[in-house]
């Protein structure tokens, strides 16, 4: 399991998943690296609750359909803004990513799958073997002033669950791709555990509430946040 270290991104350094690094004054956690360890992807320690899109009246297609690279989706939205006389205020989540500095963007569908695979220990099975990875990463993030990877509400009866994450990739019908565990059964400190839960992707509306489920927890219990990423 990776032990986090804090360092500024350097061209001569080697990194591994779980390292805490600083890029342009913004701290992030390394979530992907190439074979050399010199290049990869960091994810912001800070999360955002901002909506993908500002108003229901804007439930249009922006051509942000790229699944491999969220920066391409950022550029698609930038083109949409220029061509339609709009502004970044119409896309609060992307405006937040831009506020972090040059090069920060909301990850694509495939990038989210890669991030969760790496943070989960190399696969998409959330079980007793992989839960310690998330807990270790979460401690590193919080120790460096970041936001919790877990959340809880009345539907979880006080037990923590792993928050889903929102992608920059549009789906059909005014929706966007997100990633979360199957049926939201991801209670990390429940006495019974959550064995063999599959991490999966599905779609929510651009203006959908970030949690679903009823107070007694009889329905699906999900919550979604967003984090930005930056290549190095």
PLM regions with names:
Residues 83-86, 90-103, 109-196:
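An exposed tryptophan-centered "aromatic clamp" motif
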Residues 3-102, 121, 198, 203-232:
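Short, compositionally biased
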């Amino acid at each position: 399991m990776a032990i986090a270290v804090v360092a500024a991104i350097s061209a001569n350094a080697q990194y591994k998943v779980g390292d805490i690094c600083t890029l342009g004054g913004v701290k992030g956690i390394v979530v992907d690296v190439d074979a050399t360890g010199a290049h990869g992807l960091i994810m912001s320690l800070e999360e955002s609750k901002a909506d993908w899109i500002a108003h229901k009246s804007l439930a249009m297609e922006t051509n942000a359909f790229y699944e491999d690279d969220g920066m391409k989706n950022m550029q698609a939205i930038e083109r949409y803004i220029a061509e339609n006389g709009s502004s970044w205020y119409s896309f609060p989540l992307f405006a937040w990513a831009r506020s972090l500095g040059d090069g920060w963007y909301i990850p694509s569908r495939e990038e989210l799958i890669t991030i969760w695979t790496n943070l989960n220990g190399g696969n998409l099975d959330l079980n007793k073997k992989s839960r310690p990875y998330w807990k270790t990463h979460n401690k590193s993030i919080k120790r460096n002033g970041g936001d919790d990877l877990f959340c809880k509400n009345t539907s979880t009866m006080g037990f923590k669950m792993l928050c889903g994450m929102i992608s920059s990739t549009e789906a059909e019908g005014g929706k966007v791709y997100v990633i979360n565990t199957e049926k939201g059964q991801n209670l990390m400190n429940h006495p019974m555990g959550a064995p063999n839960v599959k991490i999966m992707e599905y779609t929510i509306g651009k203006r959908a509430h970030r949690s679903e489920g009823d107070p007694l927890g009889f329905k699906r219990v999900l919550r979604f946040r967003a984090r930005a990423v930056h290549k190095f």
